[in-house]
Amino acid sequence: MKIRPEEISGIIKTEIENYKKSLDVKTSGSVVQVGDGIARIYGLSNAKAGELLEFPNGITGMALNLEENNVGAVILGDPTGVKEGDEVRATGQIAAVGAGEALLGRVVNSLGEPIDGKGELKTEKMMPLDRKAYGIISRKPVHEPLQTGIKSIDGMVPIGRGQRELIIGDRQTGKTAVALDAIINQKDTGVKCIYVAIGQKRSTVAQIVKRLEDAGALEYTIVVAATASESAPLQYMAPYTGVSMGEYFMDKGEHVLIVYDDLSKHAVAYREMSLLLKRPPGREAFPGDVFYLHSRLLERAAKLSDEIGAGSITALPIIETQAGDVSAYIPTNVISITDGQIFLDSQLFNSGFRPAINAGISVSRVGGAAQIKAMKQVAAQVKLELAQYNELLTFAQFGSDLDKATLAQLERGHRIMEILKQEQYKPFVVEEQVVSFFTVINGYLDDIAIDQVRRFEKELLEELKDNTTILAEIVEKKAIKEDLDAKLRKAIEDFKKKFS
């Protein structure tokens, strides 16, 4: 057999050309210090801020501090499984969470894992946890109303789709109740809801889930829970997980309502994490970037332009104050980021006025553009009369000899306050609210005893619903024109004659 060198060299050449070896390069380092859910890692010189890290036993971490000779990382999961000397690998990926229709009706943790015992989740898309908010050109002014079903809010502090409206007040003043009412009122509107519980008791979260289920609201709601027993990094991640899930629906042109309950505990979790990472503390021991922590979260709520689907995320962040001090660090930060605030007053709450919304100092900076005309027509007068009533109330405490006009104004004010009272989980549709306000500002309740006002309102609305087309006309025309005004006045007068 004759050996042909050129043939052999040809075969070798072909083999060399076709040879491909893929190199899987992974940066690795080792844990030099671990404790309190924080790990310091030596050797991860190419790690990026926010990059996911792989610890042994399937534990994940996130690189946050990139220092000269080590990386400070938070451990997402059980920190007891990490020990000094463990090998850590950089994944090259940033934190992301699964999103999709399958999440509706489920309770998940900050990592998007189900914690409700209803089986596994099959999500449709991975969404980055920290995504840049949409720019100015991609947005559109707020112009569609988001009805909460609460008369004080829809009338005097209206919210539009794409708005950020802060709910602020002391503990036990009904902040969560207002947010839950808003979620329950989205039934049959097509709005998807996300409730993010940060640092709350597990029993409280269980009650909220049960309440949403009883009201038939859980089917269009995602609950993201990072309870008080979870580590600070998981509490820090929870709101970003919630908004990432919401962005999936917004990108599809759908509307989302997200509640962050509450951002005070979120800031405390971030402070704990930052101090453990040895970042320098600032005012109230919060780190210097605590404003950016909330601004980058709340800026992701938006009303998108028609060119990119016209979807929206409406955010209702909640802040807890100490003894009504709204000038503390975190409250002032969040007030300056949001488009208005709903202030819940502990004095009103304790006097039996629920929901305890103080309409005088609550404000909505952009929601007015989203109100229907019929509501604008009646609510402006309600707000004015309420302001005058509160002013007169102060004077009335000093003297009893008041003239008839002042007494009449005080009596009207008492009835407006009575009309604004509302039971929890009993939302009013917008046309019913318009009728209630119309009735009180036109003096039809002035001679009705205060303890009979709410019965009058209830029976009047039932009468209009059963025997007239007035409510349907308000929905259709969205304004009270002369003919509808006359019809409504006649209906109220006829009802008043037979009311006893």
Curated annotation (Swiss-Prot):
Gene3D superfamilies: 2.40.30.20, ATP synthase alpha/beta chain, C-terminal domain, P-loop containing nucleotide triphosphate hydrolases. Its EC number is 7.2.2.1. Produces ATP from ADP in the presence of a sodium ion gradient across the membrane. The alpha chain is a regulatory subunit. One of its GO terms (cellular component) is proton-transporting ATP synthase complex. It is a peripheral membrane protein. Disulfide bonds: none annotated. Keywords: ATP synthesis, ATP-binding, Cell membrane, CF(1), Ion transport, Membrane, Nucleotide-binding, Sodium, Sodium transport, Translocase, Transport. The record marks S362 as: Required for activity. InterPro entries: ATP_synth_asu-like_sf (IPR023366), ATP_synth_asu_C (IPR000793), ATP_synth_asu_C_sf (IPR038376), ATP_synth_F1_a_nt-bd_dom (IPR033732), ATP_synth_F1_asu (IPR005294), ATPase_a/bsu_AS (IPR020003), ATPase_F1/V1/A1_a/bsu_N (IPR004100), ATPase_F1/V1/A1_a/bsu_N_sf (IPR036121). Belongs to the ATPase alpha/beta chains family. It catalyses: 4 Na(+)(in) + ATP + H2O = 4 Na(+)(out) + ADP + phosphate + H(+). This is ATP synthase subunit alpha, sodium ion specific. F-type ATPases have 2 components, CF(1) - the catalytic core - and CF(0) - the membrane proton channel. CF(1) has five subunits: alpha(3), beta(3), gamma(1), delta(1), epsilon(1). CF(0) has three main subunits: a, b and c. It comes from Propionigenium modestum. It is found in: Cell membrane. ATP binds at G169, D170, R171, Q172, T173, G174, K175, T176. Coiled coil: none annotated. PROSITE patterns: ATPASE_ALPHA_BETA. PANTHER family: ATP SYNTHASE SUBUNIT ALPHA, MITOCHONDRIAL (PTHR48082:SF2).
